């Protein structure tokens, strides 16, 4: 009789333990397994380029070296003078609303980009070598980490360059460096070039206290 009572008590304890144990979290960081373009016909023709401006250097997103999927990457000490050609891809709805590597929130409708080694936040002019179109983007994320791709543009930026349907394009990426006094260089040379039209908004110095402040979180670890 005592043995049956002990077995009954043990069984009850096991059931209680199972009922009180939390369910394993099988949720992913992303709700979509595959990236995709937004639904509907998004018109990017009237979308303005990112406006380069001076931003204080930040630690968030600039850890160097860092590792992704077992591979080590290094962040540049400075973006000044950077220019390189390679393959551009784009990212969209899967990542929309999620945090970037420096703690900002990715918006696929803004002119932004991800790069493996440029310091963030930063700016770059990206030119589609197949059709000559160019855009200016704000680099605030890390990637792409697939194959030999050079840069990931937001869906909006890719559409302005005309390759959103193909998925990738041959591009040239030239870093835009903005100095504290508002002067700029493109791939290490004065920008805009002498004689070129000047966009007053791009040259405007936001002044002390006007620099963007964000909650920043490191995204990668060794």
State the predicted function of each range.
Residues 207-222:
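Solvent-exposed beta-strand motifs enriched in subsets of small alpha/beta binding domains
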Residues 27-36:
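Mature, extracytoplasmic segments of signal peptide-bearing proteins
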Residues 46-64:
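Short acidic, Pro/Gly- and aromatic-enriched capping/linker segments at domain boundaries
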Residues 87, 94-200:
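Exported/periplasmic cell-wall-interacting domains
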Residues 1-6:
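Bacterial N-terminal signal peptides that target proteins for export
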Residues 14-17:
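C-terminal motif of bacterial Sec signal peptides marking the signal peptidase cleavage site
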Residues 19-22:
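Bacterial signal peptide processing site
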């Amino acid at each position: 009789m005592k043995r049956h009572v002990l077995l009954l008590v043990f069984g009850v304890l096991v059931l209680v333990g199972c009922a009180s144990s939390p369910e394993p979290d099988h949720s992913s960081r992303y709700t979509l397994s595959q990236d995709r373009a937004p639904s509907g016909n998004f018109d990017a023709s009237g979308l303005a380029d990112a406006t380069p401006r001076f931003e204080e250097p930040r630690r968030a997103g600039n850890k160097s070296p860092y590792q992704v999927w077992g591979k080590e990457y290094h962040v540049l000490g400075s973006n000044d003078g950077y220019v390189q050609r390679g393959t551009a891809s784009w990212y969209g709805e899967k990542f929309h609303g999620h945090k970037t590597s420096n703690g900002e929130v990715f918006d696929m409708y803004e002119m932004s980009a991800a790069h493996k080694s440029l310091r963030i936040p930063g700016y770059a002019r990206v030119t589609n070598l197949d059709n000559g179109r160019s855009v200016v983007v704000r680099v605030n994320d890390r990637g792409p980490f697939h194959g030999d791709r050079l840069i990931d543009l937001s869906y909006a930026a890719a559409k302005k360059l005309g390759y959103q349907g193909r998925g990738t394009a041959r591009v040239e990426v030239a870093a835009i460096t903005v100095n504290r006094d508002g002067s700029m260089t493109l791939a290490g040379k004065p920008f805009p070039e002498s004689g070129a039209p000047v966009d007053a908004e791009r040259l405007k110095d936001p002044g002390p206290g006007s620099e963007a402040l964000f909650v920043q979180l490191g995204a990668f670890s060794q």
